[in-house]
């Protein structure tokens, strides 16, 4: 059944399709999940035989954009393509994976379930959509951030499906090594924090006052979670986006309602920014995207790197922020992540990863690939991206 409707300048068609939860086991053994497939097309060209462009959303754990109107990259793409948005398994309108689904499992079973939501399964889902709904027509892909990781997995598994690949800020190191990623990205986060303090010098003292108050240990968010200094530091993930510096500055401005008392507006905003309500898989799967047989366990690589850097200590002033880095404390302190705790710890210890990249196949790649690398990317290190692109691909 197709659900069709119109947005300003866009004709939308939605369909749902079942896929195996575990592609290696098949439907009978593991059951199925549902994917939401949303197709966008220029209303004036709805009957035209347009080429297909599959958008690969950033993440991990990110669902596709919900357009309000025809603008941005979608406007440009609709000039030439029929755009296909497949909500990745576990996200958006596809069968969700939430903490409650994992909390009742033992740690090993929970880790196995999480691992079924990595890039290899996502690519198999996309191939099923392409074969089933589009008659096996080849398509181009546009990958944003983590979507670039998916792109290289796709080129490793099914390059024959692809006419061209476009990537924005998302070429992984190959083979992926979590420790190497964080050794580089902590430097970028430190630089972004320093840049914020240069732009807003009064925030050095204002943020120190917030951290000092949180260090007393009795500040609760509206949902009852205790707001710790390290959870406040994690808001630095926004420094990797524009206008992240400005957003964080304006958040800090409204921190105190009275001397010593943090405002309800500030606490509500911090909860919204750090609760993972909209995307619990982002932190849960964060390090698993670097899991590879050549690299061994990810072993909480971000926490290990942070422990090597006293400048990020909660007691240091000026206070440093952290970025796109998952830490074990999140699964104790953040209410909506607690159900994942045992499973994500088991996942961090996993060594027998399914490989996501076929380096020989990538070296022989003949699918056109164009990548935009952001020179000061805080989350996907530009140096690692360029090293991968410099290799035969």
Question: Regions from the language model: what does each represent?
Answer:
Residues 251-253, 381-390:
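Short alpha-helix in the alpha/beta-hydrolase fold that links the catalytic acid
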Residues 2-223, 336-341, 354-361, 367, ...:
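Gly/Pro-rich cap/lid or specificity-loop segments adjacent to the active site
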Residues 218-350:
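Alpha/beta-hydrolase fold active-site neighborhood
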Residues 372, 378-379, 391-392:
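Hydrophobic alpha-helical segments
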Residues 230, 363-369, 391-392:
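Short, proline-enriched alpha-helix->beta-strand connector loops that line the catalytic pocket
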